[in-house]
Curated annotation (Swiss-Prot):
GO terms for cellular component: cytosol; mitochondrion. It comes from Arabidopsis thaliana. Predominantly expressed in roots. Belongs to the NifU family. Molecular scaffold for [Fe-S] cluster assembly of mitochondrial iron-sulfur proteins. It is found in: Mitochondrion. Keywords: Mitochondrion, Transit peptide. It comes from the Eukaryota. Residues 1-48 form a transit peptide. The gene is NIFU4. GO terms for molecular function: iron ion binding; iron-sulfur cluster binding; structural molecule activity. Gene3D superfamilies: Fe-S cluster assembly (FSCA), Scaffold protein Nfu/NifU, N-terminal domain. The keyword DNA repair does not apply. This is NifU-like protein 4, mitochondrial. One of its GO terms (biological process) is iron-sulfur cluster assembly.
Length: 283
């Protein structure tokens, strides 16, 4: 009904306009056609109302359509509205299922072996062309190889995500496995390390996660002043990751923590075998 009301309103506005350089014949014709349109609209609406009053078939049809839609969505749960978002890395894409993914922290799966502990990550890895999977709070970042098009991968990833959420399976087979609290401040941390972790958690990590990735704190060498970090998700392998690391993260850490002299990136090649449960981090 709102659409019809807008249509009638727009027609009224058009009919009420005066044409300065027109003739009376044109104005009369426009008014006549407008009245005819209104009359036809009124007759059509009246006939529709009468048919609803005399025959209950139309309401029954509407109810059955709503029931089928409700059963389709609520019973089988086979329909999801999944959104995608590009990242600075052209090989990575963020998928938003409209449902929470990680309740706490994030999880990175740099290889197939690391994805064996997660049914969703394992399912996505079974798609040809997928080389990395990352879980955020409400998104899944998928990284592909250069020789595969997103036009081919996206429908398969959509299906994998939809099948997972309709299956009722847990995100992880073992929720306690590999829960590395990399930025959690412990009693053994020095004041410098505590400041580094706080900056990573409150200032740097949120910005990196907006681009579909994350960072992992790997350590700090007090003698050299070097902070070691590992880029994850879309940030891993991104052409601009080195610029982000140096111009963004390094400058911020050096500005707020005088003991920091530089930042170095750790690469996944050093841990190629991975772990059965993935690199899951609890924040």
């Amino acid at each position: 009904m709102k659409g019809i009301a807008r249509l009638v309103t727009s027609l009224s506005r058009i009919g009420g306009r005066k044409v300065v350089s027109g003739t009376s014949t044109v104005t009369s014709s426009s008014s006549s056609s407008l009245l005819l349109s209104r009359r036809s609209l009124f007759i059509s609406a009246t006939n529709l109302l009468n048919s609803r009053t005399k025959d209950s078939a139309l309401p029954s049809l509407n109810s059955s359509l709503l029931a089928q839609k409700w059963n389709f969505l609520g019973g089988q749960r086979r329909t999801m509205f999944i959104q995608t978002q590009s990242t600075p890395n052209p090989s990575s894409l963020m998928f938003y299922p409209g449902k929470p993914v990680m309740e706490v922290g994030s999880a990175d799966f740099p290889n197939v072996r690391s994805a064996l502990g997660s049914p969703l990550a394992k399912s996505i890895y079974s798609i040809d062309g997928v080389v990395r999977v990352f879980f955020g709070s409400d998104f899944v970042t998928v990284t592909k190889s250069d020789d595969v098009s997103w036009d081919i991968l996206k429908p398969e990833i959509f299906a994998a995500v939809m099948d997972f959420y309709s299956s009722g399976q847990p995100l992880f087979l073992d929720s306690q496995a590999a829960a590395a609290k990399d930025t959690a401040i412990s009693e053994d941390d020095s004041e410098t390390v505590a400041m580094i972790k706080e900056l990573l958690e409150t200032r740097i990590r949120p910005a990196v996660q907006d681009d579909g990735g994350d960072i992992e704190y790997c350590g700090f060498d007090p003698e050299s002043g070097i902070v070691k970090l590992r880029m994850q998700g879309a940030c891993s392998g991104c052409p601009s990751s080195s610029v982000t690391l140096k111009s963004g993260i390094e400058n911020m850490l050096m500005h707020y923590v005088s003991e920091v002299k530089g930042v170095e990136q750790e690469f996944d090649g050093e841990d190629e075998e991975g772990t059965l449960s993935g690199e899951m981090r609890v924040e």
